């Protein structure tokens, strides 16, 4: 079983490589992804929904960079938290934001829950730029 740190490092690499197969390799069969805050009105997704969201937005981003600022591991709760800066070139200009990812691990080392907090103001502004082009 890979360590939680190694698993999360693999996910960071998969973001930068834009590789959804690598990104979802360590998730469990009962995986749930949640994009927050709730004001975005995005419901929980299973792995198929997560893959669909990734594939639908993948083409917007070029020179994608996911850079970890800090991590926190709670061994007792089988949880890791990641704070990162994200930058990318897009056809509507430079994109830059911060994200917080929370990964919940089961007893086999698989991720069963992934919560992603995004800067909703940046996300909404980016959506408006995409719609206005």
Swiss-Prot record:
Top-level taxon: Eukaryota
Disulfide bonds: none
Pathway involvement of the protein, from the record: Mycotoxin biosynthesis
Cross-referenced Gene3D superfamilies: 3.10.450.50
Function, in words: Part of the core atranone cluster (CAC) which products are predicted to catalyze most or all steps of mycotoxin atranone synthesis, starting from geranylgeranyl pyrophosphate (GGPP). The initial cyclization of GGPP to dolabellane is probably performed by the terpene cyclase ATR13. The Baeyer-Villiger oxidation near the end of the atranone synthesis, which converts atranones D and E to atranones F and G is predicted to be catalyzed by the monooxygenase ATR8. Of the CAC's other predicted gene products, the reducing PKS ATR6 might synthesize a polyketide chain.
Protein name: Core atranone cluster (CAC) protein 11
């Amino acid at each position: 079983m890979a360590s939680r740190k190694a698993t999360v490092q693999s996910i960071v690499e998969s973001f930068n490589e834009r590789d959804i197969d690598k990104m979802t390799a360590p998730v469990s069969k009962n995986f749930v992804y949640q994009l927050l805050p709730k004001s975005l009105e995005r419901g929980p997704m299973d792995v198929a929904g997560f893959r669909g969201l990734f594939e639908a937005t993948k083409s917007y981003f070029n020179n994608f960079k996911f850079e970890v600022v800090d991590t926190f591991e709670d061994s007792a709760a089988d949880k890791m938290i990641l704070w990162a800066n994200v930058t990318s070139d897009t056809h509507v200009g430079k994109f830059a934001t911060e994200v917080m990812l929370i990964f919940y691990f089961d007893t086999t080392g698989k991720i069963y829950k992934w919560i992603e907090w995004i800067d909703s103001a940046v996300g909404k502004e980016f959506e408006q730029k995409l719609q206005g082009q």
